Structures are given as structure tokens and as C-alpha cells.
Amino acid sequence: MTHILFAVLVLALLALAFGIILGFAAVKFYVEADPIVDQLDALLPQTQCGQCGYPGCKPYAEALANGDQINKCVPGGDATMRKIADLMGVDPQPLGSAEAAIPVKKVAFIHEDQCIGCTKCIQACPVDAIVGATKAMHTVITDECTGCDLCVDPCPTDCIEMIPVPTTVDNWKWDLASVAIPVKIVE
């Protein structure tokens, strides 16, 4: 019994000593983060889709702080690019290349008759837009899907297809900045 108490006491003292050492090291070797990277990261949509060419939003924010192009975030769209331009003090640019200036929004569609319920697409989806259970068919919540295309490659049966979202009154992007609105000033 005394051997057990002695072992517990020694482990507790070691844990306390290592905790003090780690606390001291955290204070002594603290590295100040770049505040602009944190601000840029807060503006990005956090989908971690990789369409910008970086493995996630934080690495893209670091690249933006180092002077990379501000128009690579497709899920963030034009609004995010304009916020980044305002923060960085640069002119807004069209998204992607010249052909991608007007992107076609796409969402994932699962052909449920071909789905085997492997859950690989659910694991790949960064925004949890796919619902389903193991060995049961899955489906996509289209309002949540960002169209990042990350769920297509892991699917072993190729039952996921990216389809364009039809333009309706509900999802139409009105360009009110270019529309002249007549105003009459009454005195």
C-alpha cells in the first residue's frame, strides 16, 4: 500500500514540476501573431475547401498578408473579396481568372440509387452539408452546400455530381450599384 502511495506522490510531483516548466516556457517563448492574419482569417468563410490553392483559410490568410492575390476565395465570393480589398487597402479584382469573373454556383447532388452509404463524402464535407448514416443513402442540404467539390473525389461509386443552381427570384444577385434610381428632392 505504501508503494502505491509513494508512486502516486512521485507522479503528482512530476506532473506539478512539468506543469510549471511548461507554463514558464509558454510565457518565455511566446510568439506574437500577426494581427492582420487574424483579421483576414476572420473575413474568410472557413470552409477549408482548398479552391484557393492553399490547404485551408488560415494559410490563405497568411499568403494574403504576404501579398498574394485577393481574388482566390471562390466560396467567399465577391463580398469577401471586397472586404479583403478594403482591409488591405488595394483595389478589388474579379474573382479567379477572366472566365471565372461570373462564377456559376454549383451544389453537390447525390444519386441516391447508387449511394452505398460509405460516409466518405460526409467526412470530406467541410460545412456538414451532407446527411446520412452508414450503409444508408445520403443526401445534400443544398442551402448549406458551398459547391467546394471536395465530396466528389472520395466517393467510390461516383454517385456525386456537381450541378448548377438554377437562377430564381430567391437566389438572384441583384446588382443595385449599377442601376440608376431616380430621386426627386422635395423642398
UniProtKB/Swiss-Prot annotation:
Record GO biological process: electron transport chain
Catalytic activity, EC: 7.-.-.-
GO cellular component, one term: plasma membrane
Binding positions for [4Fe-4S] cluster 3 per the UniProt entry: 125, 145, 148, 151
Main location as per UniProt: membrane
PROSITE patterns linked to this entry: 4FE4S (PS51656), 4FE4S_FER_1 (PS00198), 4FE4S_FER_2 (PS51379)
Hydrophobic: annotated segments: 1-26
Task performed by this protein: Part of a membrane-bound complex that couples electron transfer with translocation of ions across the membrane.
Subunit field text: The complex is composed of six subunits: RnfA, RnfB, RnfC, RnfD, RnfE and RnfG.
Name recorded for this polypeptide: Ion-translocating oxidoreductase complex subunit B
Organism name: Aeromonas salmonicida (strain A449)
